[in-house]
UniProtKB/Swiss-Prot annotation:
It comes from Synechocystis sp. (strain ATCC 27184 / PCC 6803 / Kazusa). Disulfide bonds: none annotated. The active site is at 70. This is 3-hydroxyacyl-[acyl-carrier-protein] dehydratase FabZ. Involved in unsaturated fatty acids biosynthesis. Catalyzes the dehydration of short chain beta-hydroxyacyl-ACPs and long chain saturated and unsaturated beta-hydroxyacyl-ACPs. It comes from the Bacteria. Pfam families: FabA. It catalyses: a (3R)-hydroxyacyl-[ACP] = a (2E)-enoyl-[ACP] + H2O. The gene is fabZ. Keywords: Cytoplasm, Lipid A biosynthesis, Lipid biosynthesis, Lipid metabolism, Lyase.
Amino acid sequence: MSTPEVTPTLSDSNGNEAGVQTQFTIQEISDLLPHRYPFALVDRIIDFQPGKCAVGLKNVTINEPFFPGHIPDRPIMPGVLIVESMAQVGGVILTQLPGMRGKFFAFAGIDGVRFRRPVVPGDQLIMTVELQSFKLQRIAKMQGEARVDGQLVCGGEMLFSLID
């Protein structure tokens, strides 16, 4: 009877364990979240630390379905959709927690959300979301912010609840 080999855990330059997925394509996001066009508001996850945080991006184009009505002759991304974009990044974090794959989390509240500048066609929205707490395997609190060209666009706290 032989003793099983123990392989040391390898880490990447960010301290993530080898084999841990740190980026997600739009198809992989679609496999995790139920949102579809026109409400799929995250194009990629560019950094992911399991159980901690994620950074997602949304390329904002003139072809977005909300621009014709918001606002004619001066297209601006609605603030609620910026918050929804951050929430979808948070959804990726939650669906990657142990036992949460395939579960659906909905907004339970938002606090302290502030909008600092408009998001317009051609902008690349970078959303950073951090998991602050996850209680009773049902309620999550997250802090999120969205930036364009390094400038803060929006930030605030989001609460999520597991929907059975």
